[in-house]
């Protein structure tokens, strides 16, 4: 072999090693240049008793991810209201190699160690609907203090001159849900000093059965003639409350949230006054877009995180807070029907046909 040939072979080998080093270096950078079919996202939702999660949130998020990254792998988990189960599910998602977690925390505080574990593994976390503690990368939800304010204002409006003629009962959400604390604070900011609160409860796990028992206890303690209204933090609780009120022969203003189908029907029937619609699709689409950007190694654009919030553990988190809407019997068609949550046919079953006709919904 000539010296010239040896030199050519040596140069070719060096070039190959150099290219290999560059390729290895590029692979070592999480998310850098990642293609759509390499995107792996874990979706962790908290429970299924509230109808929104399986009917709306999950399919909307999954559809948007597939639209933005057609080859994406989506690993879905539902914690069934168990904080321990959700922590185990985070471990599973990390073991599967998910690059981003969309996390709706069962317990915002106890999940902090799992969020930290994800950060340590180089995995990004998008907090969805509830702001988990720990080093979260982005957050999307509704203005939850505003939700409580709207509920409180609607209750006051429905009470009218009866506001100071008796007492109201407040049934707040789960003490482990940071959103519940914000709803509660927002409602109190409106109601305090304008009504007398006879009984107030926090309701573990947002459980309608607990709400039913609490309401029955409040009726027994206060007397049914003393209760002029009920603040309910969401529609699931309102379902349990409405049953207790009906059993006691009471029909007073009752709030809610989430625009569940049964709540819309109670509004038509006159056993619930309002609910709060938080259109799920804009929230789900935003979370999906955040997650895909992070999985592909991109920065989330400012349009998706125009503000910053502070979590319970003190982290400053880029966020998008959407605007909630009050739904009453007069605007059902312009809200939940127009937004595609339900069709008139779904709402106006035979049991509610007369009420629908009276409100012009048919």
Named regions from a protein language model:
Residues 2-11, 17-362:
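A residue-level marker of the well-folded mature domains of exported/periplasmic proteins
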């Amino acid at each position: 072999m000539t010296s010239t040939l040896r030199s050519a072979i040596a140069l070719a080998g060096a070039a190959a090693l150099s290219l290999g080093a560059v390729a290895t270096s590029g692979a070592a950078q999480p998310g850098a240049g990642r293609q759509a079919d390499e995107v792996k996202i874990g979706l962790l939702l908290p429970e299924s008793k509230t109808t929104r999660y399986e009917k709306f949130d999950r399919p909307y998020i999954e559809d948007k991810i597939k639209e933005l990254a057609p080859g994406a792998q989506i690993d879905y988990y539902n914690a069934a209201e168990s904080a321990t189960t959700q922590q185990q599910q985070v471990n599973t998602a990390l073991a599967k190699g998910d690059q981003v977690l969309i996390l709706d925390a069962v317990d915002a505080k106890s999940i902090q160690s799992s969020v930290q574990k994800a950060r340590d593994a180089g995995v990004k976390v998008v907090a969805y609907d509830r702001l988990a503690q720990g080093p979260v990368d982005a957050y999307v939800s509704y203005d939850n203090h505003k939700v409580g304010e709207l509920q409180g204002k609607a209750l006051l409006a429905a009470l009218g001159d009866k506001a100071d003629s008796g007492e109201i009962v407040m049934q707040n959400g789960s003490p482990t849900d940071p959103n519940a604390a914000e709803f509660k604070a927002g409602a109190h900011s409106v109601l305090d000093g304008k009504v007398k609160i006879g009984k107030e409860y926090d309701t573990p796990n947002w459980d309608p059965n607990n709400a039913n028992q609490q309401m029955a206890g409040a009726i027994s303690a206060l007397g049914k003639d003393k209760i002029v209204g009920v603040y309910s933090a969401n529609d699931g609780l309102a379902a349990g409350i409405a049953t207790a009120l009906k059993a006691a022969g009471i029909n007073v203003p009752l709030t809610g949230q989430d625009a569940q189908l049964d709540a819309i029907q109670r509004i038509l029937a006159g056993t619930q006054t309002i609910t709060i619609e938080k259109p799920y699709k804009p929230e789900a689409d935003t979370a999906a877009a955040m997650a895909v950007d992070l999985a592909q190694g991109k920065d989330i654009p400012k349009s998706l995180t125009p503000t910053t919030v502070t979590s319970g553990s003190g982290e400053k988190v880029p966020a998008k807070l959407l605007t909630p809407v009050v739904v009453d019997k007069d605007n059902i068609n312009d809200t939940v029907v127009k937004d595609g949550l339900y069709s008139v046919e779904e709402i106006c079953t035979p049991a509610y046909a007369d009420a629908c006709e009276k409100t012009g919904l048919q």
